[in-house]
Amino acid sequence: MKTKDYVQELNGLTTEQLLNREKELKEQLFNLRFQLATGQLENTASLKTVRKNIARVKTVLRQQELNN
């Protein structure tokens, strides 16, 4: 998914949905780090992608917080 599409999707979500998305991404990042440590991870770029997506979710949450 392209970045602009992903951010637009995030902007349409409620605060609760964003918090759930952040939790899911953090779990995914944990699993990826575990795979990296055990040598099972083939696509190391996925770590960067998930980290950036977590930052995007946090940014949208902060924007919503400031707008309310």
From Swiss-Prot:
InterPro entries: Ribosomal_protein_uL29, Ribosomal_uL29, Ribosomal_uL29_CS, Ribosomal_uL29_sf. Keywords: Ribonucleoprotein, Ribosomal protein. GO terms for biological process: translation. It holds the Pfam family Ribosomal_L29. GO terms for molecular function: structural constituent of ribosome. GO terms for cellular component: cytosolic large ribosomal subunit. Belongs to the universal ribosomal protein uL29 family. HAMAP family: Ribosomal_uL29. This is Large ribosomal subunit protein uL29.
